[in-house]
């Protein structure tokens, strides 16, 4: 079943809320997840009828790659918070792939 852009939006929002609330999250991860949100806002703005354009999706995926790497490297991050970042990354990858 294909991933809808709405699901990507929700997964990124959940990950951002959890990272912001996790006192163990590194400042680097917090900054990277904020950039992920910024790229999401740009993608939403450039979309047509709720469908993001391809270039924006690629940019968003790159931000997701950075967020995933930062979450994996953050040893003090709560496991459920790490999982939410990984879920956001996976959602954007699936959207890009059309899966």
PLM features: what roles do these ranges have?
Residues 10-16, 59-70:
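Extracellular/lumenal glycan-associated surfaces
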Residues 1-33, 85, 89-94:
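Short terminal alpha-helical segments
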Residues 17-62:
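Amphipathic alpha-helical interaction modules
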Residues 11, 39-45, 68, 94-96:
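Context-gated lysine
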Residues 65-99:
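Amphipathic alpha-helical binding modules
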């Amino acid at each position: 079943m294909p991933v809808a852009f709405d699901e990507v939006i929700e997964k990124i929002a959940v990950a951002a809320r959890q990272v912001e609330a996790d006192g163990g999250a590194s400042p680097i991860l917090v900054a990277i997840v904020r950039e992920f949100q910024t790229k999401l806002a740009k993608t939403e703005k450039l979309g047509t009828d709720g469908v993001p354009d391809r270039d924006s999706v690629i940019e968003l995926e790159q931000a997701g790659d950075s967020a995933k790497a930062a979450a994996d490297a953050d040893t003090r991050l709560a496991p459920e918070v790490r999982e939410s970042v990984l879920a956001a990354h996976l959602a954007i990858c699936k959207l890009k792939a059309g899966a």
